[in-house]
């Protein structure tokens, strides 16, 4: 199975869209045309450690942001509902590389807070990956 940043975004977007099909999921800031309520998926600072034999340990920070119209009556109620959904369903989340096979990926250090009437649900994905060596076909 291939582990990639784009597929992490796609897998998380799939989880959110399954529960909230009417809420668009964006992976980059939209200046115009954003439809509320919606989710944004961003990577936070992440680290990669090199290990033996083309293996790497990757620690990806992820921030799922839920945005709705400002100053809604009972606006925090929806934020709390989504935070509870993520608490229950995110660990582990079903990761797919597009081949049709799902692999459960655990998450770590889950935390959420409300900033400026937006939910920030943050967590880490810690995984070991192996990069295939490329053979140099050039000969002297």
Name every feature range the model reports, one short phrase each.
Residues 26-35:
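Short acidic low-complexity segments
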Residues 1-26, 47-140:
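Charged, amphipathic alpha-helical segments and their flanking helix caps
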């Amino acid at each position: 199975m291939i582990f990639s940043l784009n597929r992490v975004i796609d897998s998380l977007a799939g989880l959110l869209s399954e529960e909230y099909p009417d809420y668009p999921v964006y992976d980059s800031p939209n200046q115009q045309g954003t439809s509320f309520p919606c989710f944004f998926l961003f990577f936070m600072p992440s680290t990669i450690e090199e290990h033996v034999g083309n293996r790497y340990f990757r620690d990806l920070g992820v921030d799922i942001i839920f945005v709705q119209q400002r100053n809604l009556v009972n606006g925090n109620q929806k934020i709390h509902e989504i935070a509870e959904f993520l608490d229950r369903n995110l660990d582990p989340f079903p990761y797919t590389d597009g081949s049709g096979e799902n692999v459960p990926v655990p998450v770590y250090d889950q935390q959420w807070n409300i900033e400026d009437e937006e939910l920030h649900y943050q967590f880490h994905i810690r995984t070991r990956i192996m990069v295939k060596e490329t053979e140099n076909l050039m000969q002297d």
